[in-house]
């Protein structure tokens, strides 16, 4: 009986410590007078006449080869 009361007391103290712990925030230590210079370029070409059936077949093959066995193994491990 004494051991269960001790464990319950320790569990309550542990939970209260977590609940009332101060929030910790990560702050960047940077020079406030630093210059922020950045360049971003994006170049892309889109083909409006893409053959979706060709890509759908490739995606389907990958799903059948890897996805279904993986899903089956996960389902078996859960049950």
Swiss-Prot record:
Family (UniProt): Belongs to the formicidae venom precursor-01 superfamily.
Q: Secreted: present as a keyword of the record?
A: yes
Tissues where this protein is expressed? Expressed by the venom gland.
- Report whether Transmembrane shows up as a keyword of the record: no
**Which Pfam families would you find in this protein's record?**
Pilosulin
Note the pro-peptide positions: 22-48
Q: Where in the cell is it found?
A: Secreted
- Modified residue annotations for Glutamine amide: 78
The protein's organism comes out as Myrmecia gulosa (Red bulldog ant)
Q: Which residues form the signal peptide?
A: 1-21
Its chief place of residence is secreted
The superkingdom of the source organism is Eukaryota
Q: What is this protein called?
A: U-myrmeciitoxin(01)-Mg9a
Summarizing the function annotation, the protein's role is: May have antimicrobial properties, like most ant linear peptides.
UniProt keywords, alphabetically: Amidation, Antimicrobial, Secreted, Signal
An example of a Gene Ontology cellular component annotation for this protein is: extracellular region
């Amino acid at each position: 009986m004494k051991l269960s009361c001790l464990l319950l007391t320790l569990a309550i103290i542990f939970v209260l410590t977590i609940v009332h712990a101060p929030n910790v925030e990560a702050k960047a230590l940077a020079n406030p007078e630093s210059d922020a210079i950045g360049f971003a370029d994006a170049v892309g070409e889109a083909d409006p006449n893409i053959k979706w059936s060709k890509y759908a077949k490739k995606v389907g093959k990958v799903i059948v080869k890897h996805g279904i066995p993986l899903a089956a193994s996960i389902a078996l491990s859960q049950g």
